[in-house]
């Protein structure tokens, strides 16, 4: 089995030409590489020796992420699912605000991003991409759910995660985290919020009546 760092970002390769284009894939790879650097530094495996160079690199990656075009700015046919592209782009922005380009939580940015992501997902909840890419949806919903902590949007994320995780037959957090680690995920920064969210998801499972985003079986 690959190590967590080796798995990081692998999930995006399966989305090329469907949910992301080459430009987005390049940005997400840069974010993956940056995450690996941060992880190795925090675990003492390879401390960052040149903090100025690291900050410059981080700023370049963030600028590239924020410069990605919106879904409605893409050329026709550039991706098969504009809905999936936009959802992934916004989830990556949430991740950057927490990990690669951290912003203070009291600034209200996480609630704003969680609300924007929820609106995108609601607008395209019948898109067939969710049946085709349920694991990407899992990652998107977890990041949105973490960002929605202590907001009214939290319940929406919990309900949808309960449905998607049930469809994927995921009941243990460790199995969920393994799936998340194939995209953008830093355990030291995301694990705490993820576990809290998962407790709420499991509590909601017995009350699951419908899958809001249309994932019935995978």
Predicted features along the sequence, with ranges:
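Intrinsically disordered, low-complexity activation-like regions
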Residues: 1-218
């Amino acid at each position: 089995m690959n190590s967590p760092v080796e798995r990081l970002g692998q999930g995006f390769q399966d989305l090329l030409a469907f949910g992301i284009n080459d430009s987005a894939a390049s940005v997400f790879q840069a974010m993956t590489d940056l995450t690996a650097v941060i992880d190795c530094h925090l675990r003492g495996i390879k401390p960052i020796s040149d903090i100025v160079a690291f900050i410059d690199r981080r700023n370049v990656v963030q600028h590239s992420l924020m410069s990605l075009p919106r879904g409605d700015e893409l050329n026709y046919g550039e991706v098969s699912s504009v809905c999936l592209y936009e959802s992934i782009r916004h989830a990556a922005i949430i991740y950057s605000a927490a990990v690669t380009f951290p912003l203070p939580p009291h600034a209200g940015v996480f609630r704003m991003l969680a609300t924007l992501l929820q609106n995108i997902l609601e607008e395209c909840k019948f898109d067939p991409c969710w049946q085709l890419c349920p694991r990407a949806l899992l990652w998107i919903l977890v990041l949105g759910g973490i960002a929605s902590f202590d907001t009214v949007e939290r319940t929406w994320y919990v309900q949808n995660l309960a449905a998607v995780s049930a469809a994927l037959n995921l009941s243990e957090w460790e199995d969920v985290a393994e799936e998340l680690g194939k995209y953008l995920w830093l355990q030291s920064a995301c694990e705490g919020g993820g576990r809290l969210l998962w407790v709420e998801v499991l509590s909601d499972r017995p009350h699951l009546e419908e899958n809001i985003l249309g994932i019935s079986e995978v």
